[in-house]
Amino acid sequence: LYDPSQYELTRNPEAIRKQMTLIDQIHERGAKVIMSSHMSGDFRTAEQVLEHLRQQSARGADILKIVTRANTEDELAEVIRTTMILNKELDKPFVHLCNGSCSRLHRFIGPKLGSAIAFAVNDYNKPSLLYGQPTIRSLKTVIEAIPWHVDDVQVK
């Protein structure tokens, strides 16, 4: 079932079959499945992320999750564009996050762009906590302060 692979998404047919069988068994018990890939060290284009999440969906996952990287302003702009494309193209809930030196803004606005889940910490009083995640209080403040959601945009 476990098949370590680049970008945390196996292409091994036997491993894929086992994943799909397990997902079916989980669904039979009435539960939902989130499939998650972390490639925090790599920048991925919108097209690469969309294809990756479509593969997760094809395996039966109910919620699709991916974490990529944003270390430059251009990468951040592409991450924002990617989240909006995912919101338009996918028919399942998704979580699109990024890590990196330019990732913090996306952590705050991801839910406004269509990401189903945001991650936050209570506070930064422990040295082990990553500062990439906002605090619950600051995330809530930002989300409540922006009276906009991508689903409210009417394309002409």
Residue ranges of model-derived segments:
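Catalytic alpha/beta core domains of metabolic enzymes, predominantly
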Residues: 2-156
